[in-house]
């Protein structure tokens, strides 16, 4: 893969050609000291971008479905009705699925794929009586942040409606929800991830009747990306006589 990206870069430089894409952004990037990113760093960043959302998106898509199916109630029925309002699945219709969007957000709140986020202290700070010295690392827990009772009502319960108006509990204070991190290093693939996961579940809901066998599986905290224990996930499916 390094060779593929390196080859594309070399052709662009040889032909003095520019493109409107993320590779060009990295090729043009400059450090504070004025130096450009060396080719091996550009190819490394491209490979990271390619794989960064692979496991997190698939795991979040899985949790989204598992919570929907174990709920067996109002949410799933309303999601089916939401799909019926759209003649087809395309970019515009995917953007107009607020309940499905909220269902993905709720799955991320309850089961974020990353155990922690890490930041470096850039200057000495005092916080609630503690001294945070420059150079120290701070670890943030999206799981704990998503289950704070002062932010989310009944935080251990599955309730996608908390993300919809008028409640919008995630807006109670800045960074009240860390599904995609925050600050200048917030996940740049957030919009794509939502589009991807919502597309998957739009097609599944429109074409299949789904039912979970057994209860909600336990998260596997031994994995780099926290997904459900795969041997506990059983779902029955039946193709609809006619798609929604």
Please place each PLM-identified region on the residue numbering.
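Conserved cytochrome P450 K-helix E-x-x-R motif and the immediately C-terminal K′/meander segment
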Residues: 3, 7, 89-128, 149
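Cytochrome P450 heme-thiolate monooxygenase catalytic domain
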Residues: 1-30, 72-82, 99, 103, ...
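Conserved cytochrome P450 K-helix/beta-meander segment immediately N-terminal to the heme-binding cysteine loop
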Residues: 140-168
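Cytochrome P450 proximal C-terminal region
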Residues: 84-86, 185-186, 190-244
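Cytochrome P450 catalytic-core helices
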Residues: 56-80, 190-206
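Conserved, non-catalytic sequence blocks in retroelement Pol enzymes and Pol-derived host proteins
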Residues: 13-17, 91-98, 185-189, 225-226
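Conserved cytochrome P450 catalytic core segment spanning the I/J/K helices
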Residues: 1-61, 97, 163
